[in-house]
């Protein structure tokens, strides 16, 4: 069995421990799904990103601070080069939002610009509270119904969310929607990019299955 090198990008604001634990669990419990053995590393050196077969961009916190960290460490350009090479990358939570063109969180900030669209705050609709915290169902769009990312995952499965902002993008990029007051794009796909607003590493078996599916793409 060949080895798949997976890099977890460390730029100072990521939820690295829980993501590492999730991949360790996947390697042990989803071996029947994976066509490769896994070599998982946390990576903070931009010049080494191209050494990996797949990358995961995690993140918690504020969009502007995260982009500042990426720029100061030159990881922003390294991520763009990795994606341009055709290799697969998945962003989770804040990591998802960073893939887009801009965010309105605490001002206007430019993102990585890899997916067309922007990040906006939730509308305050009583009695719903912001941030959106907890379990919520994700419903497949027509674009997502046959996605390999969802193999073994039922339509309407529940994922764990913690966020105050969400993405707005073109419908053809949205694989699944979640509703919190109104529908928003929860899981997206463009070319070799995937992203999920929820925390798959905290979403029990369904989230781990999604990450395992990503590794098989």
From Swiss-Prot:
Signal peptide: none annotated. CDD domains: GATase1_IGP_Synthase. The active site is at residues 93, 199, 201. GO terms for cellular component: cytoplasm. Residues 5-217 form the Glutamine amidotransferase type-1 domain. The keyword Transcription regulation does not apply. Keywords: Amino-acid biosynthesis, Cytoplasm, Glutamine amidotransferase, Histidine biosynthesis, Hydrolase, Lyase. It comes from the Bacteria. Heterodimer of HisH and HisF. This is Imidazole glycerol phosphate synthase subunit HisH. It comes from Helicobacter hepaticus (strain ATCC 51449 / 3B1). The gene is hisH.
């Amino acid at each position: 069995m060949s080895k798949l090198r997976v890099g977890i990008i460390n730029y100072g604001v990521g939820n690295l421990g829980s993501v590492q634990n999730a991949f360790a669990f996947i390697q042990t419990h989803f071996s029947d799904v994976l066509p490769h053995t896994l070599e998982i590393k946390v990576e903070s050196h931009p010049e080494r990103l191209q050494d990996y077969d797949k990358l995961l961009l995690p993140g918690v916190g504020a969009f502007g601070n995260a982009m500042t960290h990426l720029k100061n460490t030159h990881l922003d350009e390294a991520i763009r080069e990795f994606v341009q090479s055709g290799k697969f990358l998945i962003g989770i939570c804040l990591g998802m939002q960073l893939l887009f063109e801009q965010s309105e969180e605490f001002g206007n900030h430019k993102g990585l610009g890899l997916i067309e669209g922007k990040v906006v705050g939730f509308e305050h609709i009583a009695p719903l509270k912001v941030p959106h915290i907890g379990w919520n169902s994700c419903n497949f769009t027509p674009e997502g119904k046959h996605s390999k990312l969802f193999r073994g995952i039922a339509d309407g499965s529940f994922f764990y969310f913690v966020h105050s902002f969400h993405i707005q993008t073109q419908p053809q990029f949205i694989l699944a929607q979640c509703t919190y007051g109104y529908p928003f794009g929860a899981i997206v796909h463009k070319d070799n990019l995937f992203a999920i607003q929820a925390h798959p590493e905290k979403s029990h078996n369904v989230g781990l299955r999604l990450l395992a599916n990503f590794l098989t793409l």
